């Protein structure tokens, strides 16, 4: 049984303990009562069971991890709840919590002890609680790394993932490059993936090979309880389409926007920030190269960053210590705050704070595990001896080995059944993929040319239908002139990337800042898209974002042939072998009539010739 299903069952069983006394008003009031700051010191059976239900609920919402604060009330109905315990009582509360976590079961680790402001000698402790580690299963968080060219994106990722500082000349970034021209230019041109693993207590498990500096992904995946995947995107403007595809197709949970302290907000920085905000992806900022930046330049850069963050209606939080890390991590999923880190890849300044933030920041994804499986493909590979490999993200449901899914749509809009014979997560073979996780599947007996980015693997229960035409509600972020019908642009909808024509719209023309409901039509082939999906379309300097509101289903080639066959059977009958004559008379009767006419004509012609002779 899956870990989440086990937690749900245990939480349900504990809830049933309170169901027996629903008729008693006093017990009902006690059930609705929250937990005060000292409930762990009492550890009554009722409070313990209530706390276990609370922790299990938080673990399910956080996909296996959550943050709790000892010495703070939980769901208290009091208007002025008291927080904080003495250090002696806090130690007792921590011991009591460890015993409770063994019953759940879960593993807890102390993050920080905080002194309450105005509370004298009262303290609280922040703990991170995780499900017990299991083999070949871990919490996965995806972070998109964006920013202007030369902001230090690849260098920071090299330092974080390989636990080695940079030499100031870009040695750390060379560990991540994939192509020859990237080594020569020092600039990322493709979507790169790098991982950072944490064990159940928050310790980093990345151990690069001392000879070739490569990471053993399989070993990291088996040792870690949480795995952070960095999606390294290009910063140069000419690679903007690759960056947009990485933001829409790889489904990041967070965005790390990099800004060079010596350069400030230049180039594509604002564009990348607006892209993340339009896709509703939480953003935190990392200011790099503070070791080589003069104090006055750094101060001016921070003023501009604060002004930019506030213009996006977010509260900037400059992270200076571990208390700021906890405060930023707890409030980050609400999308109302924007943490800002100042780091140096050469001296290592504030890098431990950034690592701890990545360790404890919670996930708040909308899980649809009970829905039918829907897997979007964002990359295709060919492996000798294995065949075609499709990688992507599971948006809903679960996929297990030997499941039969539908792959499509093809250029005709068809979907073909495909058995799942092999599943890998981070290069590690697994037996199941859950909603929100990325994975790779081996597609047997299918050529690589028949699979493309943007295709999906869906449950046959969905009965998927491809579409050429769809409607969307859009917002034009920038356009130099006006947009009219028949305008063409490149659309990014999830992993779908195709040019489409603007067929119709509500207004006569669209300008920068306008909103409207429009209709698009793909120019090449049908795609499988769902209402509610975020989209981005661009063409030159034109940028717009929107949401798919409805789709117009298109009949596949197989459906069209079936309809034509049914139509012929209804028109001519099931036993008809050919087309019906235009006058509607049966073929046999016409032939008999022609034969009779020919005999009469021959007889009359013969009699005429006899009389004439």
Swiss-Prot record:
Pfam families: GTP_EFTU, GTP_EFTU_D2
Region annotation G3: where it falls in the sequence: 232-235
Region (Disordered), start-end ranges: 554-589
Segments of this protein annotated with the region G4: 288-291
Residue numbers spanned by region G1: 147-154
Region (G5): 344-346
The keyword GTP-binding is annotated on this UniProt entry: yes
Keyword set, alphabetical order: GTP-binding, Nucleotide-binding
One of the GO BP terms on file: translational elongation
Top-rank taxon, per record: Eukaryota
This protein's record includes keyword GTP-binding: yes
Matches recorded under CDD domains: GTPBP1_like, GTPBP_II, GTPBP_III
Every tr-type G domain range: 138-367
Molecular-function GO term, any one: translation elongation factor activity
Disulfide bridge positions per record: none
Entry similarity comment: Belongs to the TRAFAC class translation factor GTPase superfamily. Classic translation factor GTPase family. GTPBP1 subfamily.
PANTHER family assigned: ELONGATION FACTOR TU-RELATED (PTHR43721), GTP-BINDING PROTEIN 1 (PTHR43721:SF9)
Name of the protein described by the UniProt record: GTP-binding protein cgp-1
Encoding gene per record: cgp-1
């Amino acid at each position: 049984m899956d870990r989440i299903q086990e937690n749900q069952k245990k939480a349900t069983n504990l809830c049933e303990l309170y169901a027996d006394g629903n008729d008693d008003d006093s017990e009902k009031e006690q059930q609705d009562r929250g937990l005060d700051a000292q409930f762990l010191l009492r550890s009554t059976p009722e409070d313990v069971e209530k706390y276990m239900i609370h922790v299990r609920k938080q673990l399910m919402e956080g996909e296996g991890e959550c943050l709790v604060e000892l010495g703070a009330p939980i769901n208290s109905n009091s208007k002025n709840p008291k927080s904080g315990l003495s250090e002696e009582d806090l130690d007792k509360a921590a011991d009591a919590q460890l015993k409770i976590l063994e019953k759940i079961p879960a593993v807890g680790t102390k993050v920080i002890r905080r002194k309450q402001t105005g509370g004298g000698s009262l303290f609280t402790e922040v703990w991170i609680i995780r499900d017990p580690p299991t083999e070949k299963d871990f919490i996965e968080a995806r972070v998109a790394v964006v920013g202007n060219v030369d902001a230090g994106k690849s260098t920071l990722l090299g330092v974080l993932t390989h636990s080695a500082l940079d030499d100031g000349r870009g040695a750390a970034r060379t560990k991540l490059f994939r192509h020859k021209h990237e080594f020569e230019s020092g600039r990322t041109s493709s979507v790169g993936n790098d991982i950072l693993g944490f064990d159940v207590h928050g310790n980093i498990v990345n151990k690069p090979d001392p000879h070739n500096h490569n990471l053993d992904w399989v070993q990291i995946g088996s040792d870690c309880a949480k795995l952070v995947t960095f999606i390294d995107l290009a910063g140069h403007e000419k690679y903007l389409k690759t960056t947009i595809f990485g933001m829409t197709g790889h489904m990041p949970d967070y965005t790390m926007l990099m800004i060079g302290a010596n350069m400030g907000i230049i180039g594509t920085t604002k564009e990348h920030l607006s892209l993340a905000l339009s896709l509703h992806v939480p953003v935190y900022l990392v200011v790099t190269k503070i070791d080589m930046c003069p104090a006055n330049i750094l101060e001016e850069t921070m003023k501009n960053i604060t002004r930019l963050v506030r213009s996006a209606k977010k509260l900037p939080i400059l992270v200076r210590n571990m208390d700021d890390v906890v405060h930023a991590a707890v409030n980050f999923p609400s999308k109302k705050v924007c943490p800002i880190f100042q780091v140096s890849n050469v001296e290592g300044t504030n890098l431990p704070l950034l690592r701890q933030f990545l360790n404890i920041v919670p996930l708040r994804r909308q899980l649809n595990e009970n829905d039918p499986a829907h897997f979007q493909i964002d990359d295709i590979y060919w492996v000798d001896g294995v065949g075609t490999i499709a990688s992507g993200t599971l948006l809903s449901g679960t996929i297990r080995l030997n499941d039969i899914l539908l792959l499509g749509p093809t250029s005709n809009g068809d979907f073909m059944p495909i058995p799942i014979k092999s599943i890998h997560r981070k290069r590690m073979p697994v037996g199941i993929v859950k909603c929100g996780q990325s994975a790779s599947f081996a597609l047997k007996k299918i050529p690589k040319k028949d699979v493309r980015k943007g295709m999906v693997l869906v449950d046959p229960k969905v009965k998927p239908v491809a579409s050429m035409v769809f409607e969307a509600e859009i917002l034009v972020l920038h356009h130099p002139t006006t947009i009219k019908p028949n305008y063409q642009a490149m659309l990014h909808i999830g992993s779908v990337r195709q040019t489409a024509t603007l067929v119709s719209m509500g207004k006569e023309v669209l300008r920068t800042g306008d909103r409207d409901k429009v209709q698009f039509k793909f120019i090449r082939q049908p795609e499988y898209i769902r209402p509610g999906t975020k989209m981005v379309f661009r063409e030159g300097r034109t940028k717009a974002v929107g949401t798919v509101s409805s789709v117009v289903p298109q009949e596949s080639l197989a459906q069209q042939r079936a309809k034509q066959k049914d139509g012929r059977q209804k028109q001519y009958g099931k036993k008809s072998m050919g087309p019906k004559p235009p006058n509607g008379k049966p073929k046999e009767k016409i032939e008999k009539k022609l034969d009779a006419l020919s005999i009469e004509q021959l007889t009359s012609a013969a009699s005429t010739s006899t009389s004439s002779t």
